[in-house]
Amino acid sequence: VTRSLLVLSGGHPYEEAPFGQLLDALGDWDVTHLIHPEGGEADAADAIGRADMLLFYDMAGYTFANGTVTTHPPSLAFRAAITARFARGMGAVAMHHAFAGWAEWPEWHGWLGGAFLYQPGEWQGEPWPDSGYRHDVAYDARIVADHPVTRGLPESFPVTDELYLCPIDESAFTPLVRAEGFAFTANNFYSAANAVSGAMFSREGWNHPSGSNCIAWESRTCPAPLVYLQCGDGPATYANPHVRRMLANALDYTSGGTG
């Protein structure tokens, strides 16, 4: 029986054709792809309850305009659909910029174990500066756990991708993969708030605590299997065979497969 995969995207630009090739390479799955906001949260809420596998590649809940960003929470129906799915033990995979989505949904970020902040804000009741980003970082992805998501992967493999410097609570998850060969310190990243205001690749007036180098993990706070993969900014990552294997493993695992 062909299993169904629901992919949610939108809210952050990406190259559609290479991403489509990534989805095609994952397996013989019946793929439904809904895009915020055109896909509609109501449509997504209905599909979320039915899909065998769920991939969040969206960054919803933001409006960027004129050098500012505003946020809004997901609809009650959308939240209820995801909460009900997890309550039934049906899992999901969140990828790359999904870590930033739904800034006004604390439960979502509690399940994920962290958040990417486009503006200075709060995480776990503490004030935090806006988060950092760095494109096209060449690093070694090192496997740190024997887990269905990492099955069949070499102990270490090269990745060139965007990395984040942001609040991450390692007590909320089981680490699976870490990025080695690159320091997660403010002087290696750029300010997200500066980028929003029009100053890309700037860290002027910005500082940030050193951060976690964990780039793949399984949540320990979500009632269903929830895996986050920070890999996934662009075509080089989409085409990386080890990233493809890890994503396919994660989708299989979170849908109740054996990995």
Where are these regions (language model features)?
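Solvent-exposed loop/turn segments at secondary-structure junctions
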Residues: 12-13, 38-39, 60-63, 98-102, ...
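An acidic, glycine-rich "communication" segment
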Residues: 2, 95-195
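Aromatic-Pro/Gly-enriched surface loop or interdomain linker
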Residues: 1-53
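Structural recognition of the beta-strand scaffold that forms the well-ordered cores
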Residues: 6-8, 32-33, 53-58, 91-94, ...
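Short, flexible loop segments at the rims of nucleotide/cofactor-binding pockets, characterized by
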Residues: 30-36, 68-72, 205
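Extracellular ligand-binding/catalytic regions of CAZymes and related secreted enzymes
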Residues: 195-259
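Short alpha-beta junction capping motif
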Residues: 48-105
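Short glycine-/acidic-enriched loop or helix-start segments at secondary-structure transitions
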Residues: 16-18, 65-67, 103-105, 187, ...
